[in-house]
Amino acid sequence: MSLPGTPTTSPTPMDEDTEQAVSVNTEPKRVKVYILENNEWKDTGTGFCIGEVDEGKFAYLVVSDEDSPTETLLKSKLEGNIEYQRQEETLIVWKDLGGKDIALSFEESMGCDTLCEFIVHVQRNIESNISLVTVKSSDNGLGSVHDIITGPVTLPSNDQQQNSQTLLEALKILNENTSFDFLKNETIEFILQSNYIDTLISHFHKAEEEKIPKDLFLLSNIIKTLILYNKRDILESMVEDDRIMGIVGILEYDTEYPTSKANHRKYLGSKGPNFKEVIPLENEDLKIIMKKCFRLQFLKDVVLVRFLDDHNFNLISEIVMDLETCIIDFLQVGTFLDRLIELYDTKTLPESSSEKEKFVQKRKDGIRLLQQCVQMSINLDAVDRSKFYKTLVRKGLFKVLDYAFHMETDSNVRILATDTIITIIEHDILLIHNVQNEDSFKRQHKSAPDDKSSHRKYPQDYSSSTDSKLLLILSTILLSDRSPGLREQVVQALNTLLHPEGCVGNGEGSYDLMGRSNYEAKNTSEDFPSFSYGLNSDSINLNNYHYSSDEMNNLEPESESEFQVMEYFANFYNKIAPILFGPLIKKDITTEMAEIDGQIEKVTKDDLLLIHLVKLVSFVCTEHDRVLSRRFILENGILDSVSKLIGGNHMMQLRLTAVRCIKNLMCLDDKYYHRYMISKNLYAPVFKLFQENIDKNNLANSCIQDFFRIIITECRAYQSDGHNRKEKTNGSYDGNGNDVKTNVNNNRTNFTILNKYLVQTYGDVLRKATDIPFIQDMLETGEENQPDHSSFENSIEGGNDISVNMSTDGFASNHLEDIDIKNVKRLHSEIEHFENDPHYSGDQLAFKKSVDQMNAST
């Protein structure tokens, strides 16, 4: 017999009033009654069906004839193990204990719903062995799918005296009950209401004490099966204080490794992390949440790492995320953070050594706690994360960081502090800066509510000092701490803090201000980009880099954001960069003075530190505003130091890093960098390194070959583009009446000049490697017009050739004074009052003065 239909959802449990009404009678519902005879359904009449319970508490389905209400068409008792099937929306089919197949076809689906609710009520209260299932066709139309609405449920034994037989039967039942949602839900209800887990834990201790391995493995499989039920309430109940050790103890036994067991309890108990209160928690509920959070993570990441499927893993992760959100919310509204920050307010320590040691340890634990809280917040959405980080900054996060980086000697703790600040600035690079601005704005607004102009003032000194403090802390750590792990984290933090992308301050947008500036600088025919914001691009004095109050009050919102970023980076080059790049600014970059055994001696500088600094040089030159970064780099002779590192007695990794830095600056196609490096003969160490490795198949040779490849590629592109544009612009004039042909060669003349210079100066070295195709092309391109010196002179907009003198070591040296003065113009912005600046060496001052004199003579 098969009557296809569609199921309904399982009825929800009824309240007492509903149950009382159903227990008497249901409302009559119009139906047709069918009886199966000879494999055919016979219509026995139409009537009204009710569910009733008589005085003897026997339940019946009764159908009265529609035409003769006193005549009964059907009276079927709900008894035994009868299975009622709901098919489609309006059909109930069953076979009574006499073997008769009966079907009720309801006029409306609501009538069918009413009688199904009656059957559910009877099963729960009178006849527990009857059942009601829905039957629907499978998706492919072949066969049918059953789903239980109500029925008898077989449950595990909760007897305190468990044995192998009862455990094996329980495991079988638990696995079978996962096949239907109804059975699964009833089993979950049983687990939670009957303390079945406590029964299992109790027997586990007995089985372990009596060494019954079969029971131990059965218990482990039972607990894993309960975890697979994927029910939050079950998981949370397992990690409660009185159960967690028993649960992880049971899970130490695994049938995949029957001869060994894990030591989860030992880890949690003695050696593992314990719940430590740095600051006493007043909220007991929060303690419970924190413990649950850790224990669930321990289960997910350690105990069950090989066992969990995606559904279980995601559920535990969601629970942990919810608990972490509760913890973060509590920290923001309570006094806990205030009491924690107070640990770092005073510099005085307790007098007794024991109390002093405890206090110092408490401060270390406080840093660990903050780092854990910040890591927790990573899973929050962006708005909630920003809110929490701003709360930390306002509460006094910098007090903690200041202690960690200036007073704490444990490198592990300092790494945690660095990780904390990295996480914050990676989320929003200007969050700390903006918090200080917001707080200062609120103070000004409160103190002068009627002064409209005060609402637009910028707390430059306050916010700048905050930004400088963070950058200075990180720079000091990089220069002074020799821990490789800490250095890597600090460099990561500096890269994030100094990256211009996304420096809008609200954490929601992206405004690549510096990148745009560099793009304009590279694609404009002017000496400097059209990027002023109230500044004279040809003469920038960073020490006087600020707006007047009237200008500040008239800034549009976008301009305010742009100014904020410009102020941020100008402040960096003014105050932090001279310290951060100090080892590269000093005249002797290979050694430094240090105190050894009470005496001041020269020691070799840290090559690993120099690698980080050279990478940062490359970073600021390529990512920051060209005007700001170029002025600092050239005025402080940093490229000279980078070039020296290529030829010094340093590790190969540092030498190649310096080569890559020179290569990156060359690729910027910036005429000021090109002229500076040619005039200072900074390519000589590159060719020395090439000579050392010219016949070797190694990384150094490959790196320098790539250097040459870039040059000839750009020269070819220039020749191709120049030829095409020359044809297109022949006889054309610009808006000012100037012949366009005169500007055809402006785009890539830097590389053609460089190629000719290298061929003229280091041709002998290059000819030793003519087997490399692009080196041969360099020679051919550089020597094409070699006899005609005017071509080389005109390519740099001048009339005099670059004089090249051979030094005793076989490498050429150039003289800046031999270059046409008109070609030099300004290698950087105007320089004012630099004689007394401690960051400028004598050579740098002499170089600047010579350039200024040449400019003055023109």
From Swiss-Prot:
Q: Please give the superkingdom of this protein's source.
A: Eukaryota
Q: Keywords of this protein's UniProt record, alphabetized?
A: Nucleus
**GO BP term, example:** DNA damage response
Q: Name one GO molecular function term.
A: protein phosphatase activator activity
Protein name per its UniProtKB record: Serine/threonine-protein phosphatase 4 regulatory subunit 3
Subunit info here reads: Regulatory subunit 3 (R3) of the histone H2A phosphatase complex (HTP-C) consisting of PPH3, PSY2 and PSY4. Interacts with SPT4, SPT5 and TIP41.
Q: Which gene encodes it?
A: PSY2
Native organism: Saccharomyces cerevisiae (strain ATCC 204508 / S288c)
Query: Per the record, what is one GO cellular component?
Result: nucleus
Comp. bias intervals (Basic and acidic residues): 441-453
Compositional bias ranges of the Low complexity kind: 1-13
According to the record, the residues making up region (Disordered) are 1-23, 441-463
Query: What function does the entry list?
Result: Core regulatory subunit of the histone H2A phosphatase complex, which dephosphorylates H2AS128ph (gamma-H2A) that has been displaced from sites of DNA lesions in the double-stranded DNA break repair process. Dephosphorylation is necessary for efficient recovery from the DNA damage checkpoint.
What PANTHER family does the record tag this protein with? ATP SYNTHASE GAMMA-RELATED (PTHR23318), SERINE_THREONINE-PROTEIN PHOSPHATASE 4 REGULATORY SUBUNIT 3 (PTHR23318:SF0)
Mainly localized where?
nucleus
